[in-house]
Amino acid sequence: RKMSRTSMETYKIRAKAVSDAEIMYGSFAIATLVGIGIDSPTVVGAQVANELLDIDGIKASFVLTGVEERVYVSARSIDEVNVQKIMEQFGGGGHLTVAGAQMVDVSLYDAKQIIKGTLQFMKEEGDI
C-alpha cells in the first residue's frame, strides 16, 4: 500500500479533474488536466481515467492532459466500448479497454471539443 501512495497535491489535482469531468450521453466522462507543475502528468491523467470508471454508469473515460504544445489523451473503458477504435481517429491506439493518443499544436480546450465532436459523430453513426 505504501508504494502506491501519492502526495496530497497530486491527490487534489486528481480529485478536481474527476469532480470537474463532463459527462456525455450519461456514459462518457471527459476530464482535462493541465500538466504544468505536476510530476509525471501523463501518469496522473491515466490514473484519473481509471478513477472515472469507478463512477456508476460511466462506460468510457477520456482524460486530456496538456503538456506544452501537446495534449495526451488517456482513454479507458468497460468492455462494451472499444476505446482503441476511438483513439485511432487521432492516430493513437491501444487495446479494447485501454488506449491513448497525442494531439500536437492544439489547446486543451480545442482538444476537448475535438474529442466531444468525435464521440458525437461515432455515436450518430452507431460506432459506439
Could you describe each region identified by the protein language model?
Residues R1-I128:
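Hydrophobic helix-and-loop "lid/oligomerization" segment in the mid-to-C-terminal part
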